[in-house]
Structures are given as C-alpha cells and as structure tokens.
From Swiss-Prot:
Keywords: Plasmid. Involved in plasmid stability. This is Plasmid stability protein StbC. The lineage of its organism: Bacteria, Pseudomonadati, Pseudomonadota, Gammaproteobacteria, Pseudomonadales. InterPro entries: Arc_rbn_hlx_hlx, FitA-like_RHH, Ribbon_hlx_hlx. The gene is stbC. It comes from Pseudomonas syringae pv. tomato (strain ATCC BAA-871 / DC3000). Gene3D superfamilies: Met repressor-like (1.10.1220.10). Coiled coil: none annotated.
Length: 97
C-alpha cells in the first residue's frame, strides 16, 4: 500500500507500509542493517532500490539504440546526434482549458 507521496526537494518520495511481514524476516533485516551500520528503514530502502534498479541493467533507450545500430538503422554519428538533441526536461501535463 502506498498511502501518499511526499515532496522532498525537487523529487517526490513514496511512503510504503508493509503488512504481515514475518518476524524472522524483520529480524534478519535488522541484523543486516546493523552489519551495514544503518537503520532498518535505510536497509529496506537499499534492498528495494537494488531490486528495482539493479546495477548493469540495460535501459530501454540504450537497448533500442543498440538494436537500431545492429540492423543498420542508425550510425554512431546519428546516435550521437539524437543523444545531444534529446529533450531532458519533464513533460508538462495537458491542459484543456
């Protein structure tokens, strides 16, 4: 359950409640947190982040660009051009007013 989104700095963070977590699991995470010198909450955040965004993952854009290069759709020069002209600002919500 994600009850709300809190804004912190320039990004939003979610608050997550985990129900029915077995005591053995909570105890193991507490021990793991102590071994890493951080709070249980910080340990859980680290576990979730590593699970959701593992190191070495291939991002979708990079994957699609590699496919295009393999089939001759984009040269390295064209790929660089797209990378340098990409819009990085967040999209604005549509307004019908």
């Amino acid at each position: 359950m994600i009850p709300l989104m809190a804004k912190t700095g320039n990004y939003q963070v979610a608050n997550v409640n985990v129900r029915n977590l077995p005591d053995e699991v909570h105890r193991a995470i507490r021990i793991q947190a102590a071994l890493h010198g951080r709070s249980t909450e910080a340990e859980i955040r680290d576990i979730l982040e590593r699970a959701a965004r593992p190191e070495g993952r291939v991002k979708l854009g990079s994957f699609l660009a590699s496919i295009a290069r393999e089939v001759g759709g984009l040269t390295d020069k064209e790929h660089t051009l797209f990378e340098n002209t990409r819009i990085t600002s967040p999209a604005r919500a549509v307004s019908f007013e």
